[in-house]
Swiss-Prot record:
Residues 391-400, 472-488 have a biased composition (Low complexity). Keywords: Mitochondrion, Transit peptide. It is found in: Mitochondrion matrix. Residues 1-44 form a transit peptide. Gene3D superfamilies: 2.40.30.160, Probable tRNA modification gtpase trme, domain 1. This is Iron-sulfur cluster assembly factor IBA57 homolog, mitochondrial. Disulfide bonds: none annotated. It comes from Lodderomyces elongisporus (strain ATCC 11503 / CBS 2605 / JCM 1781 / NBRC 1676 / NRRL YB-4239) (Yeast). The gene is CAF17. It comes from the Eukaryota. Belongs to the GcvT family. CAF17/IBA57 subfamily. One of its GO terms (molecular function) is transferase activity.
Length: 513
């Protein structure tokens, strides 16, 4: 999978929802997996982690006024010092249902990011209007929630259902646009480390706002005079360390060489500061590049699957790995199963990045000898052998049972279709019972020769190689087959093809002890 090394993209697949009002903090804190309030509510032992951070909680209560637009709380469950920072930059989170299943992932912005207005000899009506807007938006808790556009209506409906008597306003913001910039270079990684150390290490709200204003004024990333007006939200994407930067604006950014047609448009040259452009290339790229890059790094989003096909648990979506979970916030919808699972340490499945390849006899032989030599596998685009990609629930993954093993014994592949005698403590029965076919997981989504698959962790530990199965009713091989599934597909030439899968453990995953 190829994509540009750097680029800026308008995330057209994302929609924004504004949640503001006196009760907005408490309202969202009861829904999100991340923490927004300085206080905790410990009703049962398993509602928060067993660590004692009472001193930190007491300090937060002294500095955070929940009736104000203080910003957001940032914490990392893998931080041994349990630091909690206050910032105007955004954070990653999820909303669960009452059974602890994922409703949607989201990115939450404090709105507005800053109150800085660039100094100008000629103050325009637009500048004056923006100044009044900032004053109004800072008067009470105010947030922007970014969700996948395919789920925005259901999320708004759910928010309004939970609202009850809370004093909050829930508004779709179709006038605002989400943007994403990335640069896969060591220099940019170092730049983001310095950026966060310089502007996003505050522990009190006043200092957080001052740092955000200084971030804009000093042109750390963006041009303050040409782009500050209309700059709404900002955050470093730390789902993967220093993965990119996200920001929200009311302006449409256009490519180089194009003319801005109105005051609501700005060219990419006028977005980033001169200092930033001297260090890093800036160019517009399609959103497909952002998605391809995310897939190749194994970063799953709930928008990758249809809402009616998903009943995922947060740990299956690697929520604990992508900085989207607080262990000390107390009660929220779906928290009991989540925290109990974390405390028990029993997580059976996770979503892995996978690569598809042609499962030929030669590939099987190479996999068998993997310890001696790295297999050279021929990649395959899943959509080339499945003209219309079926729903994820139809594409299951099973272990390569003949690897390692006797490759010449092809009959061994049919063991799951054989019958066995049923046993009873009361009588002997000759009634045949079909042996249940083992499944290690399923393909959640695919793009070219890459995909994201939900797999049993223990199976991946044994071997990262699997084969793709599809129910015979959806397979083009035969609709009258007695088997429950088929591992054969057909390419454009009508030839039968078997598809293999190699699961990859991302380098950015924490090392499990």
């Amino acid at each position: 999978m190829k994509f540009p090394q750097t680029g800026l993209s308008h995330l057209v697949s994302k929609s924004l929802i504004q949640i503001r009002g006196p009760d907005a903090l408490r309202f969202l804190n009861g829904l999100l997996t991340t923490r927004l309030l300085p206080t905790i509510t410990k009703k049962k032992q398993h509602t928060i982690s067993s660590s004692d951070n009472s001193a930190i909680h007491a300090t937060l209560q002294d500095v955070v006024d929940v009736s104000t637009n203080y910003g957001l709380m940032h914490e990392d469950i893998y931080d041994p010092e349990h630091n909690i920072l206050i910032g105007r930059d955004g954070l990653n989170s999820m909303i669960l249902n009452s059974k602890g299943r994922v409703v949607t992932d989201l990115y939450l912005y404090a709105m507005p990011f800053s109150t800085y207005l660039p100094e100008s000899e000629t103050c325009t009506d637009n500048d004056s209007l923006w100044g009044k807007t900032l004053e109004s938006e800072m008067s009470q808790p105010n947030f922007l929630m970014e969700v996948d556009s395919s789920r925005v209506k259901s999320v708004i409906l759910m928010l309004k259902m939970y609202k009850l008597a809370s004093k909050v306003k829930i508004l779709p913001r179709d006038d605002l646009k989400s943007y994403y910039y990335y640069n896969d270079s060591a220099e940019f990684d170092d730049f983001l480390d310095k950026l966060q150390g310089e502007y996003f290490t505050s522990t009190v709200p006043r200092a957080a706002l001052d740092s955000a204003n200084r971030f804009i004024k000093e042109n750390a990333v963006f041009q303050s005079k040409k782009f500050a007006t209309g700059f709404v939200g900002f955050g470093v994407d730390y789902r993967i360390p220093n993965f990119g930067i996200k920001f929200v604006s009311n302006k449409q950014i256009t490519a180089s060489g194009t003319e801005a047609g109105s005051g609501d448009q700005v060219t990419i040259e006028n977005v980033f500061s001169d200092t930033f452009k001297q260090q890093f290339q800036v160019q517009m790229v399609p959103e497909d590049a952002i998605i391809d890059r995310r897939f190749s790094n194994g970063l799953f989003e709930t928008g990758d699957v249809a809402a009616d096909e998903s009943s995922l648990l947060p740990f299956e979506c690697n929520l604990d790995y992508i900085n989207g979970l607080s262990l000390d916030k107390g009660c929220y919808v779906g928290q009991e199963l989540t925290i109990r699972t974390y405390n028990n340490g029993i997580i059976r499945k996770r979503i892995y990045p996978v690569q598809f390849f042609k499962l030929t006899d030669n590939a099987k032989e190479q996999i068998k000898q993997e310890r001696e030599k790295e297999p050279v596998l021929e990649s395959i685009f899943l959509e080339n052998v499945i003209p219309t990609t079926p729903s994820s629930s139809k594409l299951t993954l099973s272990p390569l049972q003949d690897v390692p093993g006797d490759l010449q014994n092809k009959a061994q592949e049919q063991t799951n279709e054989q019958t066995q005698k049923s046993s009873s403590p009361f009588e002997t029965s000759s009634k045949p019972v079909r042996k249940r076919k083992s499944s290690s997981g399923k393909v959640m989504s695919s793009r070219g020769d890459w995909g994201l698959a939900l797999l049993t962790i223990s199976d991946v530990t044994k071997s990262p190689y699997f084969k793709v199965d599809m129910p015979s009713s959806s397979s083009s091989s035969s609709s009258s087959s007695s088997s429950s599934s088929s591992s054969s597909f057909y390419n454009d030439g009508g030839n039968k093809v078997e598809v293999g899968v190699k699961a990859i453990v991302p380098e950015w995953w924490p090392i499990e002890e």
